[in-house]
């Protein structure tokens, strides 16, 4: 019974660490964006970049979280599995940023953002960081640290909200 209680508690905390940031992001930024971006096309850029982000995160993490959980179960190799997965995502994230910067013109053309290279570069950096952090967050889940996991997720969104509001108001 103790394990069931622990599972329920951790599920609740991990769930809050996932749902609260998404709710905050939606509840705060959606009204803010609709006031800031008078032209609906400008708000459409934000929405479209989020759609690209979802697809690219799947590609850039290439199932590494699943592989991490599968192989980290062998206690003697846990540190090696973690470092290998982390280095792999670091290398692919850096290569992604380099690729985007080297081929910025064709990438912006494919995404229909010609002459908006800054959008593409910032976007690539955000996607690369998100992909890279997948394994540290998976490690927190593996180590049964739901409060730390959720706190970092929520703090991350709060910082994002503050920066977005601050930077778009300038």
Where do the model's predicted regions map?
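Hydrophobic transmembrane helix module of multi-pass membrane transport proteins
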Residues: 88-170
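Hydrophobic/aromatic positions within or immediately flanking transmembrane alpha-helices
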Residues: 15, 44-47, 86, 120, ...
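Transmembrane-helix boundary and interhelical linker motifs in polytopic inner-membrane proteins
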Residues: 4-5, 34-43, 56-90, 108, ...
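Signature of the first transmembrane helix
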Residues: 5-65, 93-101, 126, 157-161
